[in-house]
Amino acid sequence: MKFTCIDSFCGAGGLALGLKRAGFEILVSFDASAPAVESFQRNVSPNCLHARAEDLTGRRLLSDAGFEGVPDLFAGGPPCQGFSRQKRGAHLGDARNGLVLEFVRLVSEIKPRFFLMENVEQLGKKRGKEFVDKLNAELAGYELHPFFFNCADYGLAQTRVRFVIVGKSRKIKAPFQLPAPTVKRWLTVGEALADMPEPPADSSVHPALPNHYRTKVTAINTQRFSFVPQGGGWRDIPEELRLKCHQRVDVRSGGWPDVYGRLRLDGQAPTITAGFDSFTRGRYGHPLQERALTPREAARLQGFPDDFHFCGTRRDVRSQVGNAVPPPLGEALGRAILKTLRNEQATYKPRV
């Protein structure tokens, strides 16, 4: 028996890859980014639409999937930059958060047995309460299971915390249980990158590994970074070499602790963002070399296999890697949902 899924706001395909590993058949996907769609089609499935959510309907998605009936899962991670840590005040009215409402609309139209929404940590906190309340009101036919995940608990060498809502149709009687951690000990950066060869010095792509290339660094930044030990940051740089803004900051204040940060081999990476290719944007410095992470290294820390080829410009690739749902997290969530669907099928009644 096949279990079916429609994947929305799919990006390069991290969530879909995890759901496929769990056992779902991905019927159709969509994203507004052409390079992300190209990556998805190359690595996950050719049936991926280059389209905006606002221009799609549930009927259109089911038609493009060639599917009649009720899909088992509607999944996605709609962007909502308005829920950033820096943003204050009301958030649901922020135009940047409109896509989460498009996600709700498509769930209402498609009426899947389950839905899965992955998003930023802040959406599940106080500033996201208005959205969660709206979700409860508009999707009253679903039993909601909101929770937070630390991706390190699911096999990543990264302490990425995400907010996830799983909605189960109230027609399903079998209980849903949140996925338990899949590892007893957190993977370290050193273990994750252990066999990774050094990227070419001229910033070209490594001949054996797609997307494995270094970002060019100025001589002064290379010199600054050479003083930073594993786990260190800008405060380890001699004062005469620091940026002027760092010279004016009291070291004891702890300002910008991750800028010029170097990863520890025996620790975990922070959240991988689209800025991972520069140690001036955060703790993305290689543990042993005077450079930032390559896209391939960042993709490993996100849980992607080495043969997953990200398409587009280097800027496109950064965005796809940093914005991806880690495949191991998608797989853990998919297995938990499938367990409920299989229990329903075996214990209660056949699907219709």
Where in this protein do the model-derived segments appear?
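A short, Lys/Arg-enriched amphipathic alpha-helix followed by its capping loop at the start of a domain
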Residues: 18-25, 43
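S-adenosyl-L-methionine
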Residues: 38-66
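Class I S-adenosyl-L-methionine
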Residues: 59-70, 81-253, 257
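Extreme N-terminal starter segment of soluble prokaryotic enzymes
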Residues: 1-5
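Conserved SAM/SAH-binding beta-strand->alpha-helix loop
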Residues: 33
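Class I SAM-dependent methyltransferase "Motif I" SAM/SAH-binding loop
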Residues: 9-12
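C-terminal target-recognition/interaction regions appended to catalytic cores
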Residues: 212-352
